């Protein structure tokens, strides 16, 4: 492992800018995060070839999340996809701070992936799922705007994003739990949603001391964010895979990836079953009047 790290010359090939920027040690850590994402992606893709219940929806979702995470962390570990922004605080310590926008690209995909997975598990409506995804996008984009604002007005964007996060927490912990109770999946749902919201609670804190307040170094910020991201996407991916083995996919109405748009073989196709047609009731013949 030491030999591998000594070969890391990414920051020599891609020189860093800004008074506070990524260090070689930070790049080493980010390569390790990239490796975990890549390995998880390969495992998930392999498992999708023969999924339980014949359904691949959760495999598809987390495979996308893991692949995007691999690409974005590769970019960050290589010292790419960043901007240098003047700091609003600590001007005597560092006049500029390195902001990696690839991190936000990862979240724009990762947050909707877990939201969609939880929505499918809980059985909430598609309108609720779309609403939750837009809340996540508002959260991430507001934080991105905050990171790129060099004045104290950045905290306005931070407040908007945090408000969207609080709404999202309510949606996943209350609305989703209420819906999951109908399917007798309250325990599994609360385990997954509770873990996700515990991680989400730490993202505003991490942002506040990193890209927002510029209180910690770029390397320390990526140690913080890297752990959170690993526990969120790879962690939840394998948790979903483990718990889904005993879920009733028919009750969840998730039988829509084991066959194509055209029925080409045998399988469980609940939404293709036509409702039974009641037999018509014929009227009794009129009685012939007596003569």
Regions from the language model: what does each represent?
Residues 26-51, 77:
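First transmembrane helix
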Residues 43-47, 80, 84, 92-96, ...:
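Internal transmembrane alpha-helix with an interfacial aromatic "cap," most often the third helix
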Residues 155-158, 175-198, 218-222:
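Membrane-helix boundary/juxtamembrane motif in polytopic membrane proteins
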Residues 61-79, 201-208:
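Hydrophobic alpha-helical transmembrane segments of multi-pass membrane proteins
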Residues 8-38:
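Hydrophobic transmembrane alpha-helical segments in integral membrane proteins
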Residues 42-45, 142-146, 164-185, 202-210:
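Alpha-helical transmembrane segments in multipass membrane proteins, preferentially the mid-helix core
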Residues 1-3, 249, 253-291:
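Intrinsically disordered, low-complexity terminal tails of fungal membrane proteins
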Residues 25-35, 162, 190-193, 197, ...:
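Extracellular loop 3-seventh transmembrane helix
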């Amino acid at each position: 492992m030491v030999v591998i790290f000594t070969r890391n010359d990414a920051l020599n090939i891609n020189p860093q800018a800004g008074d506070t920027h990524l260090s070689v040690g930070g790049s080493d850590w980010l390569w390790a995060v990239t490796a975990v994402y890549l390995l998880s992606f390969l495992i998930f893709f392999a498992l999708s070839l023969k999924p339980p219940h014949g359904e691949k929806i959760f495999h598809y979702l987390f495979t996308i999340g893991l692949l995007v995470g691999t690409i974005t962390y590769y970019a960050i570990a290589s010292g790419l996809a960043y901007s240098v922004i003047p700091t609003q605080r600590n001007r005597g310590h560092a006049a500029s701070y390195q902001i990696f926008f690839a991190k936000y690209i990862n979240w724009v995909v990762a947050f909707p992936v877990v939201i969609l997975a939880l929505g499918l598990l809980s059985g909430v409506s598609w309108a609720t799922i779309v609403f939750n995804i837009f809340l996540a996008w508002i959260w991430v984009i507001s934080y991105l705007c905050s990171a790129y604002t060099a004045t104290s007005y950045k905290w306005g964007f931070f407040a908007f994003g945090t408000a969207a996060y609080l709404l999202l927490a309510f949606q996943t912990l209350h609305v989703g739990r209420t819906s999951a109770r109908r399917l007798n999946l309250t325990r599994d749902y609360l385990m997954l949603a509770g873990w996700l919201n515990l991680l989400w609670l730490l993202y505003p804190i991490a942002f506040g001391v990193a890209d927002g307040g510029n209180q910690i170094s770029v390397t320390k910020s990526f140690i913080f964010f890297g752990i959170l991201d690993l526990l969120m996407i790879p962690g939840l991916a394998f948790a979903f895979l483990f718990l889904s083995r005993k879920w009733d996919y028919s009750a969840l109405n998730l039988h829509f990836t084991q066959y194509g748009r055209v029925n080409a073989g045998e399988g469980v196709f609940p939404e293709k079953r036509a409702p039974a047609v009641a037999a018509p009731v014929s009227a009794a013949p009129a009685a012939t009047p007596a003569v």
